[in-house]
Amino acid sequence: MITLDNFESCVPYRILVRGEEYYDTDAVSELEETSPGEWTATVEGTDDYNVEISMNGKEVESWYCDCPYDGEICKHVVAALLAIRDNNKRVSR
């Protein structure tokens, strides 16, 4: 089970580092919880990529990115997950 607390250990190191770079340089924009547990974001890379993430509490149920990467999880999804986790920390304070 992938969660907001453990997803970093479930992602290949190179993808994680690239996702962290995108997150750290504010490449994630338009982060929005469109309905409970349903998140969308735009991540600026070579182009702007649309990311969708479905969650149940802290559990990540599914994700989608319209980038051309054909691996299981891309750097854009990682960046969006970092943004969601950061957003949830700010809201819960």
Functional labels for PLM-detected ranges:
Residues M1-R93:
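Long, low-complexity, compositionally biased intrinsically disordered regions
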